[in-house]
A protein has these predicted regions:
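Mature extracytoplasmic/periplasmic domains
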Residues: 35, 286, 290, 295-355
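Conserved C-terminal helix/tail region of periplasmic/extracytoplasmic solute-binding proteins
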Residues: 351-382
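Early extracytoplasmic/lumenal segment of secretory-pathway proteins
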Residues: 36-102
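A ligand-binding cleft/hinge motif common to bilobed small-molecule-binding domains
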Residues: 98-103, 260-275
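Paired acidic/hydrophobic, glycine-rich loop segments that form the ligand-binding mouth/hinge
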Residues: 89-94, 240, 257-262
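Extracytoplasmic ligand-binding site segments that recognize negatively charged/polar headgroups
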Residues: 75, 96-238, 242-246
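N-terminal secretory signal peptides
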Residues: 1-11, 18-22, 26
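Periplasmic-binding protein-like
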Residues: 224-233, 272-296
Length: 382
């Protein structure tokens, strides 16, 4: 993949768009529900994705009342939908690699997307294409539409790690003596980040952590060594986090000076305190894609498609990026995201580190439960 210079979100994501242009067709002729003056849509979403300015715009533009419920992890969302038998919500936002986990016995809890009703042509073609491999298609049906993408990388206090240039940033900073008692991380993610660090150092061979998806034996071989390294450095544990608020609090209230965080956390911290920097580590930023899906028991389908189409509008998608720092999968969103967004993107990303991103893979049958065992080992060591 090649990149224009200077690099932008748009130039990076549109690479390969010509070869996948067919994905933008057929043109969407209708926008069911959009602009109607009544109805309700029940949305279950990550806590910071749909903020008040987006709610106000949606309700004003459509006349549809938006009932918002939020969650902080894929596990929480999956468990909630399984408990309700797929009912109670019209829209949910699963990470695309987590979509397969909505299989509940013989029932799949997400329904096929009617691509004649959703403005899928607004999605960046390469993102729409790549989402297939990541899990958006199940049992031959597309069940998820790309919504946004982002990274989980390293946030650090540059006054503590004085002299550290962008090329020096590493997941290993969490285990540096300078971060003693002040390292923040999500346990499931630190297994990957530290694994990438140890792989790069030649201490744990893992095929850049892809072996943990290969087989249960390989997963345990790698995670055993990575978890042992983390536990051996438990004096650096400062704060665990499982959602955006907890990650912010780790730095703002608990005094952490280094951590693995989502991009939204790192960029928001940087806006308030410039010495806190969010950067891609040399081992590669961990990358995810979230999506929009319709639960099998959704009751308000017209309103659900109206909501999807509103989120796929470049202006609305730009609001999401400006609010959160996350990157939209909608073509044209970046032009509506504002100067702060553009500036921070240029500070964090370049052609080299974008080419070095590490993508979360679709969960394999043994992965989630096996990973949880090592999460528990780390948690219990604190």
């Amino acid at each position: 993949m090649t990149f224009a210079n200077p690099i932008t979100r748009r130039s990076m994501l549109k690479a390969g768009a010509a070869s996948a242009a067919f994905l933008a067709a057929p043109a969407i002729l209708t926008r069911p529900g959009f602009g109607q003056s009544s109805g309700t849509v029940n949305v279950f979403v990550w806590g910071d994705y749909v903020q008040q300015n987006m709610i106000d715009k949606f309700q004003k533009d459509t006349g549809i009342k938006l009932n918002l419920s939020t969650y902080g992890s894929n596990d929480e969302a999956t468990q909630k939908l399984k408990a309700s038998g797929g009912k109670g919500f019209d829209i949910i936002f699963p990470s695309v690699t987590n979509v397969a986990n909505y299989q509940d016995g013989d029932t799949f809890l997400l329904q096929p997307i009617d691509e004649t009703k959703a403005k899928v042509g607004n999605v960046i073609p390469s993102m729409y294409r790549d989402s297939i491999q990541l899990g958006a298609v199940q049992n031959g049906d597309r069940v998820a539409i790309p919504f946004n993408w982002g990274t989980e990388a390293v946030t650090f206090d540059s006054t503590v790690f004085e002299g550290a240039g962008d090329a020096d940033v590493s997941y290993g900073m969490l285990w540096d003596p300078k971060a003693k008692g002040k390292a923040a991380f999500r346990q499931k993610s630190v297994l990957i980040g530290t694994g990438l660090y140890l792989d790069a150092m030649g201490e744990v061979q893992s095929n850049r952590m892809l072996d943990v998806y290969k087989s249960e034996e390989d997963m345990r071989r790698v995670f055993d060594k990575v978890a042992s390294y983390i536990v051996d450095h438990r004096e650096n544990f400062g704060a665990f986090w499982n959602n955006a608020t907890e990650a912010l609090n780790a730095f703002q209230q608990s005094g952490c000076v280094a951590g693995q965080t989502w991009d939204s956390t790192g960029l928001l911290l940087n806006r308030d305190k410039p010495e806190l920097k969010y950067r891609m580590p040399k081992e590669g930023g961990m990358t995810w894609m979230d999506s929009m899906a319709i639960p099998s028991g959704a009751e308000n389908l017209d309103q659900a498609y109206a909501f999807i189409n509103a989120m796929l509008d470049p202006e609305m998608a730009g609001l999401m990026s400006a609010n959160t720092g996350y990157n939209s999968c909608v073509d044209g969103a970046a032009a509506n995201a504002g100067e702060v967004y553009a500036r921070q993107f240029a500070e964090v990303y370049n052609a080299d580190n974008l080419a070095n991103l590490w993508w979360w893979q679709p969960d394999t049958p043994f992965f989630a439960s096996g990973q949880q065992e090592y999460v528990d080992r780390i948690t219990n060591a604190s």
